Amino acid sequence: MASRAGPRATGTDGSDYQHRERVASHYQMSVALKSEIKKLNIAHAVVWFLVAAQVLVSQLNLVSHKVVASPYQWEYTYLLSIIPTVFSFMALPKNNISYLVISMISGGLFCIGPILYGGMEMFPVAQQLYRHGKAYRFIFGFSAVSIMYLVLIISVQVHGWQIYYSKKLLDAWFTNTQDKKKK
């Protein structure tokens, strides 16, 4: 294809792509991981909002305890799990390593810890439900223990992936800083 001024100059026919600069892989990985972490943070915020709504509705007696059961003990400590998500959101825009590390550590403490405790706290009630078919706590007509175990399963996956992707992102950021120190 020729230009208005005549034939193209040699070397501009598109075959010179091998000499062009490319985006370093750790930058590409950083963008992809940030996107995944943002999605997981939003998923966690939704789960957190649902747990917070149940605790708030129950504590303020907005509806009968027959409609929304009183919260389990682990749900109160799980409300602290918004802290790692806030630090994660603060870490992503400027690649702040300190905030990301705080998010990962507090994620284990405030997210995974209450979930493990909740699984153990609700186990006898779940065992009674599945052995004898008796449930004493309900959330909108459904067994509270079944709903809360579903919340636990979703939360474990969300927080596990958050910590995993945060670790991968941290590795990508450290690769970036190591490359800068070498120059």
Curated annotation (Swiss-Prot):
It holds the Pfam family Jagunal. Residues 61-71, 121-137 are lumenal. Coiled coil: none annotated. Residues 1-39, 93-99, 159-183 are cytoplasmic. It comes from the Eukaryota. It is a multi-pass membrane protein. Keywords: Endoplasmic reticulum, Immunity, Membrane, Protein transport, Transmembrane, Transmembrane helix, Transport. InterPro entries: Jagunal (IPR009787). GO terms for cellular component: endoplasmic reticulum; endoplasmic reticulum membrane. It is found in: Endoplasmic reticulum membrane. GO terms for biological process: defense response to fungus; endoplasmic reticulum organization; granulocyte colony-stimulating factor signaling pathway; neutrophil differentiation; neutrophil mediated immunity; neutrophil migration; protein transport; vesicle-mediated transport. The chain crosses the membrane at residues 40-60, 72-92, 100-120, 138-158. Endoplasmic reticulum transmembrane protein involved in vesicle-mediated transport, which is required for neutrophil function. Belongs to the jagunal family. This is Protein jagunal homolog 1-B. It comes from Danio rerio (Zebrafish). The lineage of its organism: Eukaryota, Metazoa, Chordata, Craniata, Vertebrata.
